[in-house]
Amino acid sequence: MKIKLVSDLHLEFSDCFINNNEGADVLILGGDIMIAQDLHDHHAADFNPYSNGALADLSRKMQRVARFRDFFKRCSFQFPHVIYIMGNHEFYNGKFYAGIDYMREEVAKYPNIYMLEQDTKIIDDVVFVGGTLWTNMNKRDPLTMHAIEGMMNDFRIIRNDKRNYAAMSALDVAIRHDKTLGYIKLIVEEHKDKK
């Protein structure tokens, strides 16, 4: 099985064309591909004509969403299987759990694109397991968690929709890391006799 891995495309800034000249069976989109919130925000119902710069903002979001969807169509057409794993940037300007839902809804439109967020996909007897792994914050070290919250954009622009939309915290990220890592270890153990 041939696997092609790409990440950090940041389609919110410009388009990117991925070809399959290698004849890969699986394309893995390994995070920081797009912003999930844009898939939700571009709807006309969200448009406020009285806000400053609203038309330009709506137009930019619509262009980004069109770019995201064209990218997915091209990937779906060129590769027999596409695995999508969200990175931290997918959650920017949005809500953590809702962002996962927006991406699942979008990916479900393509029969050969699979999102792995504490999920497993078996392709030709090969087990793929994945999820956004985040970080354990140096084993939840309080000094690390305090310092990192002041330094990284993630903790200013990602909201935790299970905590009254408060900003994501270092503890939120460490908890999610532990859950995802636990899931991956469980699946690896369950499928230890497989590829």
Stretches with model-predicted labels:
Residues 1-4, 120-130:
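Beta-strand-turn-beta hairpins that frame and shape the catalytic cleft
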Residues 1-84, 91-98, 163, 167-170:
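N-terminal active-site segment of His-dependent metallophosphoesterases
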Residues 14-22, 70-76, 115-124, 183-194:
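Short amphipathic alpha-helices and their capping/turn segments at secondary-structure boundaries
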Residues 36-37, 92-94, 123-128, 136-139:
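Short catalytic/ligand-binding loop motif for oxyanion handling, primarily in non-cytosolic enzymes
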Residues 81-83, 114, 127, 195:
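Proline-centered loop/turn at the N-terminus of a beta-strand
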Residues 97-116:
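Glycine/small-residue-rich loop that forms an oxyanion/phosphate-binding "nest" at active or ligand-binding sites
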Residues 129-194:
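Active-site-proximal loop/helix segment associated with metal-binding centers of metalloenzymes
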